[in-house]
Amino acid sequence: MKSVMSKIKLFRPVVTLRCSYSSTDQTLLLSEFTRLCYQRDLPRAMKAMDSLQSHGLWADSATYSELIKCCISNRAVHEGNLICRHLYFNGHRPMMFLVNVLINMYVKFNLLNDAHQLFDQMPQRNVISWTTMISAYSKCKIHQKALELLVLMLRDNVRPNVYTYSSVLRSCNGMSDVRMLHCGIIKEGLESDVFVRSALIDVFAKLGEPEDALSVFDEMVTGDAIVWNSIIGGFAQNSRSDVALELFKRMKRAGFIAEQATLTSVLRACTGLALLELGMQAHVHIVKYDQDLILNNALVDMYCKCGSLEDALRVFNQMKERDVITWSTMISGLAQNGYSQEALKLFERMKSSGTKPNYITIVGVLFACSHAGLLEDGWYYFRSMKKLYGIDPVREHYGCMIDLLGKAGKLDDAVKLLNEMECEPDAVTWRTLLGACRVQRNMVLAEYAAKKVIALDPEDAGTYTLLSNIYANSQKWDSVEEIRTRMRDRGIKKEPGCSWIEVNKQIHAFIIGDNSHPQIVEVSKKLNQLIHRLTGIGYVPETNFVLQDLEGEQMEDSLRHHSEKLALAFGLMTLPIEKVIRIRKNLRICGDCHVFCKLASKLEIRSIVIRDPIRYHHFQDGKCSCGDYW
């Protein structure tokens, strides 16, 4: 296919027909062409343009600009090419303003090569010319080209404006580039511009520097909804949900109305902290955007990850439009919350709706099979994903199958599948096998898997802890101590167990061995009372979950202060009986706490939901949604 410039050159040898029109006729012809352009009558305007060209006439730049805008709005690429040829016909040179409009047209048509060729042909370029091209490459994620053009622009002694900087900042992949541009912005006196500050906040957040983003934000005298969204979104994306929510409160106090993008970030923050009450508050703001697909998807995700499946399904069922993200989110949510059969039924509904699954959908389906021990179903979906949906298995799919096989006691098959992976197993894959070894108490294979994980991720404290757990279950205290010594020698610290609970819109954290909570005395008293009552109905501490060689009473005392038990006691103290007690934990719930919560839900007649890094446990009437298969 010929480029636009080669097509233009084909017209240059043509001899222009000398105008046989009178000056009055010329004026009428130009007037008619102008009228048609401003009326956006594209077909008739193109015919009138042919008449102009055949008589060697050209209209003014503003008229052509209107015609080009008409082409852009109608995606009329062919007509746009004809206008470009006309403007360069027989050696004619359009003004810089009009060339910039043409470049913008080709950018809008995603014809960057044609746009750049016109740009290269320009005898002179202004800030609009450069900024249009830089912005185009930045939006198309051709970041290096955008940065190179900025360097050439500066060499050409053209000063960047706020739009140049806001565009090129989003092409920075390293802090050194950002620092350099930030200096240029200050030098040009543009640091107070809202577009520049918004771009700076975005790039700092993208590069994992939210504190720098907050510094830029706090220096602003005034802001707008765009800037607020940038800073809130930045902290939400960097797993700083607490700061994101605090900024959202500041935004509301400042009188700004949250738009879709901001609300999506707020929902992401609530999801990260499992804050159902705050998420519900955000839902109130979303009512006016009830048909916004992205927001509804975020709502479904938030409710699923806060363990409120009724609300998630309500939003899902009320949605008039669903995409693959909607279906995948709901399928994964059901699976993670222990409703595997419902997840697989929803997958069948998804297929019936005509929505094609993607690789994330299949991860959710395999996750459902893994969490319910559906071995035959898991093999079927895994083996058919390529044939039926054209999806090649990736690490996440293999991980689900290894977990499923391991929990089913088929460790040999799990190892065989791991060795047959089409991609290189990573630390997560080996860690999954290690977890299966814990369930099956296979110490030899556990040691092998742990070595693989440590080789790939030597700083991972969780692997050492898991291996130590396996040794402790087998009463191998010398091996437990050896693991601890290795951790000390390498400067690796075990992450302490921490649980969070939301009460009256406030987050309360409980950490094992930490007595800093202002009500810790009352909480401990409540917990001791609960343990005493549970002992009366058959609760016996499972001391094999203690990772220390202690005497019986010491072991029981160690289990007594697990963070989820403290959070549960606090919830029983502070939340009304009709409220579900929702707890988020940073580590996997241990077997003793699992039994404890089942019995507590029956004794206290309460619904308890605990979210750990692996799944959600819904305790009610002495049972758990996981069916003790975890």
Swiss-Prot record:
Belongs to the PPR family. PCMP-H subfamily. The lineage of its organism: Eukaryota, Viridiplantae, Streptophyta, Embryophyta, Tracheophyta. Residues 536-630 are annotated as: Type DYW motif. Its main location: mitochondrion. Pfam families: DYW_deaminase (PF14432), E_motif (PF20431), PPR (PF01535), PPR_1 (PF12854), PPR_2 (PF13041). Residues 1-76 form a transit peptide. Residues 429-504 are annotated as: Type E motif. The keyword Repeat applies. PPR repeats lie at residues 60-94, 95-125, 126-160, 161-192, 193-223, 224-258, 259-289, 292-322, 323-357, 358-388, 394-424. PROSITE patterns: PPR. GO terms for biological process: RNA modification. This is Pentatricopeptide repeat-containing protein At2g03880, mitochondrial. Keywords: Mitochondrion, Repeat, Transit peptide. GO terms for cellular component: mitochondrion. It is found in: Mitochondrion. Residues 505-535 are annotated as: Type E(+) motif. One of its GO terms (molecular function) is zinc ion binding. InterPro entries: DYW_dom (IPR032867), E_motif (IPR046848), Pentatricopeptide_rpt (IPR002885), PPR_At4g14850-like_plant (IPR046960), TPR-like_helical_dom_sf (IPR011990).
